[in-house]
Amino acid sequence: MNGKSSVLDSAPEYVDKKKYFWILSTFWPATPMIGIWLANETGWGIFYGLVLAVWYGVLPLLDAMFGEDFNNPPEEVVEKLEKERYYRVLTYLTVPMHYAALIVSAWWVGTQSMSWFEIVALALSLGIVNGLALNTGHELGHKKEAFDRWMAKIVLAVVGYGHFFIEHNKGHHRDVATPMDPATSRMGENIYKFSTREIPGAFRRAWGLEEQRLSRRGQSVWSFDNEILQPMVITVVLYTLLLAFFGPKMLVFLPIQMAFGWWQLTSANYIEHYGLLREKMADGRYEHQKPHHSWNSNHIVSNLVLFHLQRHSDHHAHPTRSYQSLRDFPGLPALPTGYPGAFLMAMIPQWFRSVMDPKVVNWANGDLSKIQIEDSMRAEYIKKFTHNVGADDKRGATAVAS
């Protein structure tokens, strides 16, 4: 027996108390179908908006009730935990769940008599869960195995965001918490303005990265080896079939659910690194990203439906680490609630800023020069925050203004 095996065999017995609760992440995409069933059984069309109520209302309340979990798996059991097949299988099973939600919802809209209000409510509900197909693709796309990476492309095709596979792994993880990253929001930048640079910026960066990769291999960017075109083709075929089978209502239903799915990623990107900035070194490069360059959340319930996405700090420190092994660290910048509640706050900019701006300033120890700030808000922030900091911090704030 080699030394490595001995270490694994002698690892302390660890019990993941959440092990069988992770199945909530797998079944979360089925929620729109539950809404359809309830609407059909009761005759109340309001149930088509079930996911909206659960996501923006019920989950934040449950997060507040059940609180946070700061427990970590011991480092010596992480390798063994990573190899446990159960956790990976749950992510695989989530992929067909996303397809089922899309196809069943499209079938229902195409074959039933529904008001436009009901169609939009169901489209938005589907958009939330299929927006979180991006989360499933995120978990699978960081893996090294070819099967996992193809599963990521397949699930990203559900919501027509196949370029995320390239953009996130090769772009966002490289540039996060710097001015070069369109997926890092600035303090004072509202989510609506952020979306206008994040959505097109993400696609441009992904396309450029893939063009460079293929060029190095002597291939055209229009080659089918283009990993952006692969899921894009799946999306086109899938949506064309849905249109052919379920009729012209799909011309409204599919774009709405897709747009709201994209909005979920925009919301996540907006809150995950809001205002945070890596320090620029003497050679002009930015410091290596660290766990404190991401906003973290240990809220139990929302983490259980998001494959631990909210332990975002450790994810950026160890991108290939699976969800069940992600850790919390002392002193991390922390969101006041889980992602559903934070997404809701973000849609009301004054509310979000009133909660998060002081947190960002505290994160920077009052030095505004260490924060990414929206240009139009600089003067306001200098006036608002410099009276609470010392002379050294005021010099930092002055440096920001210059």
From Swiss-Prot:
Entry keyword annotation includes Cell inner membrane: yes
Please tell me which top-level EC class this enzyme sits in. Answer: oxidoreductase
Co-factor: note: Binds 2 Fe(3+) ions per subunit.
Enzyme Commission number(s) of this protein: 1.14.15.3
Q: Where does Fe cation 1 bind?
A: 138, 142, 168, 172
Q: Which cofactor does it need?
A: Fe(3+)
Q: Which residues cross the membrane?
A: 20-40, 42-62, 89-109, 114-134, 146-166, 236-256
Binding-site positions, Fe cation 2: 173, 312, 315-316
Which membrane topology describes this protein? Multi-pass membrane protein
Q: What is its main location?
A: membrane
MF annotations from Gene Ontology: alkane 1-monooxygenase activity; metal ion binding
Catalysis performed (reactions): octane + 2 reduced [rubredoxin] + O2 + 2 H(+) = 2 oxidized [rubredoxin] + octan-1-ol + H2O
**Domain of life of the source:** Bacteria
Its annotated compartments are: Cell inner membrane
As for what it does, the entry says: Catalyzes the hydroxylation of n-alkanes in the presence of a NADH-rubredoxin reductase and rubredoxin.
Q: Which family does it belong to?
A: Belongs to the fatty acid desaturase type 1 family. AlkB subfamily.
Name this polypeptide is given: Alkane 1-monooxygenase
This protein's encoding gene: alkB
